[in-house]
Structures are given as C-alpha cells and as structure tokens.
Amino acid sequence: MAPLKMLALVILLLGASLQHIHAARGTNVGRECCLKYFKGAIPLRKLKTWYQTSEDCSRDAIVFVTVQNKAICSDPNDKKVKKALKYLQSLERS
C-alpha cells in the first residue's frame, strides 16, 4: 500500500510542477515573459534581433537575442535599451 501512496504523491507533485511551468509562459508563440530586467551593459555588436514580450505578461519588456541565441530581458524605458533598438533598426535598413 505504501508504494501506491508514494506513486500517487509523485504524480500529484509532477502535475503541479508542470502546471506551474505552463503558467509562466506568455501567449507570444512560446516566448516567455520576463521576470526581471538585465542591469548590465548591452553588447551591441553581439545582438542579432529583438522582440517585445506579449501584452499578457505582467512586465513590459524588450528581449534582445544575441548571436549565441541568449535572451536578454530589458526595460523598454532604459536609455541603453533605446540605443540598442536604434542600432538594430539601423542594421535592418542597410
């Protein structure tokens, strides 16, 4: 009987953890919401692209993607972020 109770507990915990993981995602085609902003320098020459998080996310953010496919969550009101956006937009035009 004890192994059956243990199995039920494991299934319950697994189900709860999967529900938590699913709830953290936004509706932006599988892209996740940002929980906090990156505070360091933004490496302009290593940036590949960017996107804005979904309106369903609790925190408005710009996400920069580097050439190594790493995501950098950034505050859209930060001067460094605006500079990085202008840099990427100038690359798109040329």
Swiss-Prot record:
Subcellular localization(s) per the UniProt record: Secreted
Signal peptide limits: 1-23
Disulfide bonds: 33-57, 34-73
CDD domains linked: Chemokine_CC
Annotated Pfam families: IL8
Sample GO molecular function, one term: chemokine activity
PANTHER family with a match to the protein in the record: C-C MOTIF CHEMOKINE 17, SMALL INDUCIBLE CYTOKINE A
Keywords: Chemotaxis, Cytokine, Disulfide bond, Inflammatory response, Secreted, Signal
Name assigned to this protein: C-C motif chemokine 17
